[in-house]
């Protein structure tokens, strides 16, 4: 839980919590758009657990044997929207705008197919860090071994699998700023594209959000509205060619908890070893500044070892590991990691 020194009442009463399953079907999954007016597919209470199934990109249409040309056609079939298949939304009783939703990622179980692709740079010259240098596009498929948690890239190269959700979104921010680049954020129906990360989470691509981690998101709409998708089984920081090792999940089990006592603007996360602070902007330098400011805010506000804002800035410079989450989602992402081990006062 987030430190009691920062927010009180961090052990909510979860007596009576229930467990649910939300399968991914055409009725429970949307392709590339978030819509706060979408009818909830499940209604839960704070502290309940949900096992969510997810699909591969483009409503499970990218599977072994599908060519890069066919992937291009699928991409063009949903202009402005993301390629992501997102399961939801899930309505959380009691969640109100201004609250924080604390989302525990309890378990991730993969399906067996995965892929990575980059779109043809000659057709999509700005999609992917080096798109113009790779004009033809490329797709590669993988079989994922859940027992060994590995996959073979090619003979002689075996990859360890580290699954995490690339997209975990709450209902969109009604005041999200207008796009500075790329296709419009909103379509004619008022839906929000899953392409860009923002304060409500969405396409964050932070590879630390693995099993056992906890994500904290600002609630913008009544009921919070949780969507899950863009399932990843491995990703390097940067996600440079456009995609990770994209996959889908038999289930990702989450436990959302409504926090009335914690108020944040930007996404935060924690693992057993680190606190994590995020920033997103079309300008990578601005994304870095946002993430660093959020780190400083946390350190200056925490009461475990009180410090000035100047001391927090200094400490951030010495211990925060600020990583480029992704550079391919129009809004670029940075996440700064502060090790918990530096706080030795009991």
Sequence positions of predicted segments:
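Short, well-ordered loop/turn sites that connect or cap secondary structure elements
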Residues: 44, 92-95, 209
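Short, structured beta-strand/loop micro-motifs enriched in basic residues and often containing a Trp
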Residues: 24-35, 79-87, 192-200
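A generic structural signal for residues embedded in beta-strands
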Residues: 52, 100-103, 217
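Short, Lys/Arg- and Gly-enriched loop/turn segments at beta-strand edges
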Residues: 57-69, 108-119, 223-233, 326-328
């Amino acid at each position: 839980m987030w430190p009691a020194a920062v927010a009180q009442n961090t052990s909510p009463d979860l007596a009576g919590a229930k467990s649910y399953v939300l399968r991914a079907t055409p009725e429970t999954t949307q392709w590339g758009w978030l819509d706060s007016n979408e009818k909830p597919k499940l209604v839960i209470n704070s502290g309940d657990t949900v096992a969510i199934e997810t699909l591969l990109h483009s409503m499970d249409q990218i599977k072994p044997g599908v060519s890069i040309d066919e992937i291009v056609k699928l991409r063009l079939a949903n202009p402005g929207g993301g390629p992501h298949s997102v399961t939801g939304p899930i309505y959380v009783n009691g969640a109100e705008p201004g609250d924080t939703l604390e989302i525990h990622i309890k378990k991730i179980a993969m399906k067996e197919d995965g892929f990575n692709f980059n779109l043809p740079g000659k057709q999509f010259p700005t999609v992917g860090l080096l798109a113009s240098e790779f004009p033809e596009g490329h797709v590669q498929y993988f079989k994922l071994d859940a027992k060994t948690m590995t996959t073979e890239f090619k003979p002689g190269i075996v990859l360890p699998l580290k699954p995490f959700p690339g997209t975990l979104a709450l209902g969109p921010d009604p005041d999200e700023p207008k796009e500075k680049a790329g296709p419009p954020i909103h379509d004619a129906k008022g839906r929000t594209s899953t392409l860009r990360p923002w304060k409500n989470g969405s396409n964050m691509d932070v590879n630390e959000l693995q099993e056992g981690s906890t994500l904290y998101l600002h609630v913008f709409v009544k009921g919070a509205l949780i969507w899950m998708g863009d399932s990843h089984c491995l990703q390097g920081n940067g996600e440079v060619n456009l995609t990770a090792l994209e996959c889908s999940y038999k289930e990702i089990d989450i436990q959302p908890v409504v926090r009335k006592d914690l108020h944040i603007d930007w996404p935060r996360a924690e693992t057993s070893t680190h606190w994590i602070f995020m920033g997103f902007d079309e300008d990578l330098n601005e994304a870095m500044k946002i993430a660093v400011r959020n780190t400083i805010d946390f350190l200056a506000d925490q009461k475990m070892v009180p410090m000035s804002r100047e001391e927090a800035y200094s400490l951030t410079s010495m211990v925060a590991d600020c990583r480029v989450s992704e550079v391919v989602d129009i809004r670029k992402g940075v996440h700064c990691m502060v090790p918990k081990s530096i706080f030795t006062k009991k």
